[in-house]
Amino acid sequence: DDRPLLILVSQSGETADTLAALREAKRKGARILSITNVVGSSIARESDDVFYTWAGPEVAVASTKAYTTQLIAFYMVALNMAIKKGTITKEKYFEVLDELKTLSGKVESLLEDIEAEKSIAQRIKEKSSLFYLGRGADYQTALEGSLKLKEISYIFTEAFAAGELKHGTIALIEEGTPVVAIATQKDLVEKMISNIKEVKARGAYVYAITTEGETEIKKVADEVIYVPETLDLLK
């Protein structure tokens, strides 16, 4: 099949603009792969191939299950494309698959003790604004974290690419501004430490999120939340 491939994502499978894009792409000869949660939805019916996330109904206001399962779906698609194209080895392929299976257990272990997170929530709930920083894949997590906080707390919050900090962003930081700095990518920790120092020089109070075993972040951040280590591909 030499048709161009369009990958669409829609939790409901009924998103109007996504459905319009699907129909236009099909009209122009594209093959459609959709990632959706709802069996029998319009997007699922009109796609050539469907990857169901099977996340079930979203009970919380914030769409956490759908987002997480969509990420995993994208990983699975990318992994299978990579193995077919020969850009990763079979050993690496199965290593990532095996690690994927451990993620739910790691999340459960993280949720066993959330006293630190509760304490932080109590302190930031009266703040008028909060900023997230991240580099690479951590920037995408920062964007999602910012969105979730907006949706459920009604606090003004924005996420910024830490590498662009000097281009206007840092001017928003003032004394006492809470900043969440996400630094789980080992090769980017050093640069994130520099960013943390920059915002702290402006008076920010920094909550860092990093992986277990990382020792340098705590020397510059005000507080640190540790998450379980995993493959860089899955962070």
Predicted regions and their residues:
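Glycine-rich phosphate-binding loops that contact phosphosugars or nucleotide phosphates
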Residues: 1-102, 182-224, 230
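Extended hydrophobic-aromatic, low-complexity segments
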Residues: 15-19, 119-120, 140-144, 151-152, ...
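Active-site phosphate/pyrophosphate-binding segments
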Residues: 49-178
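A signal for specific C-terminal beta-sheet/loop modules enriched in small/flexible residues
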Residues: 154, 226-227
